[in-house]
Amino acid sequence: MVRKGSNRTKTSEVGDEINPYGLNEVDDFASKREKVLLGQSTFGDSNKDDDHSLLEDEDEEEVLAMDEDDESIDEREDEEEEEEEELDGAAAYKKIFGRNLETDQLPEEDEENGMLDNENAWGSTKGEYYGADDLDDDEAAKEIEKEALRQQKKHLEELNMNDYLDEEEEEEWVKSAKEFDMGEFKNSTKQADTKTSITDILNMDDEARDNYLRTMFPEFAPLSKEFTELAPKFDELKKSEENEFNKLKLIALGSYLGTISCYYSILLHELHNNEDFTSMKGHPVMEKILTTKEIWRQASELPSSFDVNEGDGSESEETANIEAFNEKKLNELQNSEDSDAEDGGKQKQEIDEEERESDEEEEEEDVDIDDFEEYVAQSRLHSKPKTSSMPEADDFIESEIADVDAQDKKARRRTLRFYTSKIDQQENKKTDRFKGDDDIPYKERLFERQQRLLDEARKRGMHDNNGADLDDKDYGSEDEAVSRSINTQGENDYYQQVQRGKQDKKISRKEAHKNAVIAAREGKLAELAENVSGDGKRAINYQILKNKGLTPKRNKDNRNSRVKKRKKYQKAQKKLKSVRAVYSGGQSGVYEGEKTGIKKGLTRSVKFKN
C-alpha cells in the first residue's frame, strides 16, 4: 500500500516536470482540489491506518504495478464467468433488470412460475428499462430470448376465447343461433326439419298446406276470407248510385283490398327469393292493412243514401227554402216593430248574415267531406317517418306524454267525429259574431223595455201615495207608442254617440301616426310634438318612433381586442412612411426617376440615439 502511495507522489512529480510552461492560478486550484479529494477518500484512510507505511521505503517502486481498478475489473470478469456457468431464472432476471427477484416461492418450484406471477417484477428506476438491448454476451441473449418465448407461451395460454373472435365468425355464430332457434321452434310445433320452398308448398296436399300456412303465417287465412267476402261488395258499390257516401265507401274498400293483394304479392316474392323468410309479422304492409281496415270500418258505417241531391238544382232549392224561411222571420219581426226602422234594417242585416253563414256552413261541410276523401286516398301512400332536425334523446317522461298526445290527435283526425266537431265550432263562431262588441251597450228589446216600465210604474205607485189616479184601462198600444217614442230617441243618440266616438278615436290615431312618420322624414318631428292633439295627447317624439334605447353609439372594435390592435397597427403603418423611408419591394422596372420628386428640405434618415 505504501508503494502505491509513493507511486502516486512520483507520478505527480513527473507530471510537474512534463509541463514545461508551469501552472497558472486555475490549474493550481484544480490540482489542490484533487489532492484534498484524494485525502478524504478511502484510499487516504487506508494509507493512514496501515502500520507498514512507516517500514516501507518511499523511494521503492514496484515494476509493472497493478492498480486496484485493474484488480476489480479482473474480479468482475471472474464473477461473470462463474455466473455464466450457472445462470438460473433469478440470476437472469438480476442480470437483465439489475435487481433481485422478490418471490415468496420455494426454490423447489418450477422455474416458469418464478417471474410472471410476481407483481413487483418491473422496477421503478430508469436503469431497469434502458440499456437492456446492449448485451455483450451471447449466452445472456439466449437466456433472454428463452425467457421471452416462455412469457409469450404463458400469455397465449391465458388468452380467452373471446379474444380470438372476429366479426365474420360472430356473424356466423349469430346465424347458427338463429337456425338453432328455428329448429327448436319447429320441434315445438312438430314441423319437419327440412326447409320448405315454394315448390314444396305447391306440391303439398290441401291439409298439409293449410297447416303450414296456419303455423307460419297465421294472418293468411283471415285475410283471404275477408278478401273473398269483400270482393263482391266492391262490385256492388261500383254499380250503385253515385253519391258522396258511396264514393267514400268505394275508395276505402278499394284501398283495403289493394293492401291485401299487396300482402299476397310480397308473400309470394319472399317465398321465391328469400331462403330465410319465415314470417310477415315485422313487415310494414301489416300496419297498412290495419290502417285501411279501420278506414273501411268507419266508411261502412256511413248511410247508403244522401238526403240532399247534388248539382245546381239542389243548391237552388236549398237557397229557396232558406230565403222563404228568412222572409217569414222578417215579416214577424216587422209586425212586432213597425215604427223602429233602424232596428228593422239591422235585423235585415243579421238575417242576411245568417243566410251567408248557412251557405258557408254548407260549403264547409262539402270541404270536410272532400278532406276525408283526400285522407282516404293519401292513406294508401307509404308514409315515411319524419326525421327531426335536433334528434336529441330526452330523459324526461313529458316527451313521451307529448308523443302519446300527438298520436291521439292523429287518431282523432281519422274519424268522422273530427269533422262534425269542426262544423259545431263554426256554429259557435257564428253565434259569437252576433254578440257584438262588449264596449257598445245593447239596445233594449221591446218586451224587456215594457216589463221595465211596468215595474217602475208599480214601484212609483207603491211609494207615492199622492200620485195621480190611474184609470181602469189596460196598457194598450198608445202607451206603447208613447213609451217607445220617449225612450228610443235618447237611446239611439247615446248608442250612436258611443259608436261615433270609437270611430273618431281610431281615425285620429291613424292620422296622428301618418303625420308623425311624415314629420320624421322631413325632420320636423320636434315641431309636431309641440302641437297637442284634440284629445289632449302629444305626438310621439323621435326616441319613441325610432326606439333605439338609452345606450349611446359604441365602437364595435372595443368588443374584440385582437381586431382593435390590428386596426391600430394598420393605422400606424400608414403614418410610418411620412416619418422615415420604408422599403416597399424595390425597383419594379427601369429607373424612371424619383416619383415623388427630390425635396431639398426633407430629411428621412433616422437619427441614432446614444
From Swiss-Prot:
Gene Ontology cellular component list: nucleolus; nucleoplasm; nucleus; small-subunit processome
Keyword annotations of the record: Cell cycle, Nucleus, Phosphoprotein, Ribonucleoprotein, Ribosome biogenesis, rRNA processing
GO molecular function: identical protein binding
Basic residues: compositionally biased ranges: 561-578
Record-linked InterPro entries: Sas10/Utp3/C1D, Sas10_C_dom
Ranges annotated as biased composition (Acidic residues): 56-88, 105-114, 351-374, 392-405, 469-480
Compositional bias annotation for Basic and acidic residues: 46-55, 451-463, 501-511
Subcellular location: Nucleus, Nucleolus
Single biological process term from Gene Ontology: maturation of SSU-rRNA
Polar residues: compositionally biased ranges: 484-500
UniProt function note: Primarily required at the G2/M phase. Essential for viability: involved in nucleolar processing of pre-18S ribosomal RNA as part of the ribosomal small subunit (SSU) processome.
Miscellaneous section: When overexpressed, has a role in the structure of silenced chromatin. Overproduction causes derepression of gene expression at both HML and HMR, as well as at the rDNA locus and at telomeres.
Protein known as: Something about silencing protein 10
Annotated organism of origin: Saccharomyces cerevisiae (strain ATCC 204508 / S288c) (Baker's yeast)
